[in-house]
């Protein structure tokens, strides 16, 4: 591998942004793009009331509801670093998509609302990060609103998320008294003027906390800041890069994404601290990013990114080697060679064809129904990357088609939307229904809305009478045949034609599991 190739890998930073809904994640994403020069004007994100919408919220239903329901992938440069930012769904109903995205990143940025502290979705996502030892940087947001004290927030993060906190910036006041941020790394005090839409550089900067001008500007807050900084320098956990990289320590920054407070300090520290692409596990061995042969895996599929063309894009994380336009790769699950002629990079729905890409980069491949989540592509070696999950749904609805003549379009729409993995479709063995299964109920509204706008299918849904699903398998063909015969009315095939048991309640599921000890009831499956 030549020096330039190695340099390209080392300057890449691929990360996901995670948070509870409404913590300000999409706004922070916008501001990172703004400071990175990828956009010149940030969309004012005001949920349902906004007349404009965030760059990363591109699907019609996202604009309508003011939430992110799909993962956007955005690339930009900052201080000679190549950044791949994955803005994940914040709404809890879309957690499965977020879990998968976390398999494609090298680190994560966790956003916490200063008033609400650690919330349930944050705890769930933290669990996923912990399973993968993902390094996490924390941004405590909305300091321009009244909230908890910084020390209380740090204590709550340590208690609830079981991770050591190291503050690298410190706020001056909060709410109406919020004046700016002290950079504990650079030993600089930044006083900011609010600026929602453009990169504001008009704030004052102080290198010396003993400067008398501070007392005139801040009054009692200047004294408090000096006391806080003295306490932090003596008592706070020192930053230890190894602890951070192992996921045991989180550097913490404070600010207000909406008003650009603390965003530049966060980005400056992030590119220096966050890890470049690292080795990835496969079934047979670990793959280093510095290997010469190309390899990568698909962690997401998105239908209709361009509704005019009804296209489907497979999002592929490059793990080793280098992509070059027109290269031939092996699609291992399908057992065939394919040519990748028009790979794209993204800024939300905007796409650009590229000539080359490196480990850490996320590229889009046109998918005509043959690529699935979890698929591995390599130049030669038959590898299979591991750890991309699919979860049993917890909510179920029966599809009602209002125009029976549209059944073909319904079938096509459901097939393509289920490829994305956010909703699952089950076809009962004993009926001709389509049963939708999802991790959260909002997904049903999204599916019906997308069927209407993207496929011209007017459909609705009704309760399906199921409370749990489990994929079933057995080492004995005879046992499986007997199980199928006795439980045919409760069995269905999923989108991958895998046999699934649908239970009306948890009690019934437990009873059947106890009755059939030689059947495995799987709550999660690895994609491919």
From Swiss-Prot:
Keyword terms of this UniProt record: Cytoplasm, GTP-binding, Nucleotide-binding, Protein biosynthesis
Ranges in coiled-coil conformation: none
Q: What Pfam families does this protein's entry cite? A: EF-G_D2, GTP_EFTU, RF3_C
**GO MF entry, a single one:** GTPase activity
Cited InterPro entries: EF-G-like_DII (IPR053905), EFG_III/V (IPR035647), G_TR_CS (IPR031157), P-loop_NTPase (IPR027417), PrfC (IPR004548), RF3_C (IPR032090), RF3_dom_3_sf (IPR038467), RF3_GTP-bd (IPR041732)
Which top-level group of life is the source organism from?
Answer: Bacteria
tr-type G domain location, by residue?
10-278
What does the entry list as the binding residues for GTP? 19-26, 87-91, 141-144
**Record's Gene Ontology CC terms?**
cytosol
Is Transmembrane helix one of the keywords? Answer: no
Q: Is the Cell membrane keyword given for this protein?
A: no
Q: Name one GO biological process term.
A: regulation of translational termination
Subcellular location(s): the record lists: Cytoplasm
Q: Identify its protein family.
A: Belongs to the TRAFAC class translation factor GTPase superfamily. Classic translation factor GTPase family. PrfC subfamily.
HAMAP family in the record: Rel_fac_3
Q: Which PANTHER family match?
A: PEPTIDE CHAIN RELEASE FACTOR RF3
* NCBIfam families in UniProt: prfC, PRK00741.1, small_GTP
Function (record text): Increases the formation of ribosomal termination complexes and stimulates activities of RF-1 and RF-2. It binds guanine nucleotides and has strong preference for UGA stop codons. It may interact directly with the ribosome. The stimulation of RF-1 and RF-2 is significantly reduced by GTP and GDP, but not by GMP.
Protein name (Swiss-Prot/TrEMBL): Peptide chain release factor 3
Q: Which organism is it from?
A: Syntrophobacter fumaroxidans (strain DSM 10017 / MPOB)
